[in-house]
């Protein structure tokens, strides 16, 4: 593990994880709403 990580590497990783989290949340909420409306 590097003691001094690349400053340009951290925000990209954080952005990618937040993007995947947002997609997952949108996907789960979409499934919940679709089950709500079609039930």
UniProtKB/Swiss-Prot annotation:
Keywords: Membrane, Photosynthesis, Photosystem II, Reaction center, Thylakoid, Transmembrane, Transmembrane helix. It is found in: Cellular thylakoid membrane. GO terms for cellular component: photosystem II reaction center; plasma membrane-derived thylakoid membrane. SUPFAM superfamilies: Photosystem II reaction center protein L, PsbL. The chain crosses the membrane at residues 18-38. One of its GO terms (biological process) is photosynthesis. It is a single-pass membrane protein. It comes from the Bacteria. One of the components of the core complex of photosystem II (PSII). PSII is a light-driven water:plastoquinone oxidoreductase that uses light energy to abstract electrons from H(2)O, generating O(2) and a proton gradient subsequently used for ATP formation. It consists of a core antenna complex that captures photons, and an electron transfer chain that converts photonic excitation into a charge separation. This subunit is found at the monomer-monomer interface and is required for correct PSII assembly and/or dimerization. PSII is composed of 1 copy each of membrane proteins PsbA, PsbB, PsbC, PsbD, PsbE, PsbF, PsbH, PsbI, PsbJ, PsbK, PsbL, PsbM, PsbT, PsbX, PsbY, PsbZ, Psb30/Ycf12, peripheral proteins PsbO, CyanoQ (PsbQ), PsbU, PsbV and a large number of cofactors. It forms dimeric complexes. Belongs to the PsbL family. This is Photosystem II reaction center protein L.
């Amino acid at each position: 593990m590097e003691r001094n990580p690349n400053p340009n590497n951290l925000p990209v990783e954080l952005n990618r994880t937040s993007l995947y989290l947002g997609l997952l949340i949108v996907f789960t909420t979409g499934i919940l709403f679709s089950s709500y409306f079609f039930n």
